């Protein structure tokens, strides 16, 4: 399959079927008490379609969908794979339906990548939670276990955030 055709095919599958989600997990042993966990996934009954997508991105894994083993799930959930393989290739695709969601997802993934080896500021985590909930609001079927207010109360904000341009 030629590259232009392949990219159009993958873009169509992503626009129609992909999930760009960010789970928010309470984890008491973390300083900010919350973990922000981005995941890219596609569910299909055809492994062939998912293998084309997996080979295009060069990362992720295929597995039976839990609770619906007749379906196959393509998942990319390692931060390094999301940042180094998935995001650069998604940047090149002509997404239409998922474009806005992808831009939000990209910002969350790249922020997490930049923070990986630094002391995490809880206010940055708080901002990522807000962006994650905004991303969820783009999908009418999206359901969150906890309200945004409940999550925000859990996160200690240890540093006042200065508005841009003020010093």
From Swiss-Prot:
The keyword Hydrolase belongs to this UniProt entry's keyword annotation: yes
GO biological process, one term: intron homing
Annotated keywords: Endonuclease, Hydrolase, Intron homing, Nuclease
Enzyme superclass (EC): hydrolase
Gene Ontology MF terms: endonuclease activity
rRNA processing found in the keyword field: no
Alphabetical list of PANTHER family matching this protein: INTRON-ENCODED ENDONUCLEASE AI3-RELATED
Main function: Endonuclease involved in rRNA intron I-gamma homing.
Name of the protein: Homing endonuclease I-ApeII
């Amino acid at each position: 399959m030629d590259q232009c055709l392949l990219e159009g095919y993958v873009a169509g599958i992503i626009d129609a079927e992909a999930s760009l989600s960010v789970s928010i997990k309470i984890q008491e042993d973390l300083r900010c008490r919350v973990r922000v966990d981005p995941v890219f996934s596609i569910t299909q009954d055809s492994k062939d379609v998912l293998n084309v997508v997996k080979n295009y991105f060069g990362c992720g894994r295929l597995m039976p969908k839990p609770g619906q083993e007749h379906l196959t799930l393509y998942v990319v959930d390692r931060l390094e794979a999301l940042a180094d393989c998935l995001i650069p290739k998604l940047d090149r695709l002509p997404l239409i339906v998922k474009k806005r969601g992808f831009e939000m997802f990209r910002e969350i993934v790249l922020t997490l990548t930049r923070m990986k080896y630094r002391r995490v500021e809880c206010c940055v985590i708080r901002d990522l939670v807000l962006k994650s909930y905004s991303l969820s609001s783009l999908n009418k079927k999206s359901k969150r276990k906890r309200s945004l207010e409940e999550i925000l109360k859990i996160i200690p904000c240890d540093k006042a955030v200065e508005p841009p341009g003020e010093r």
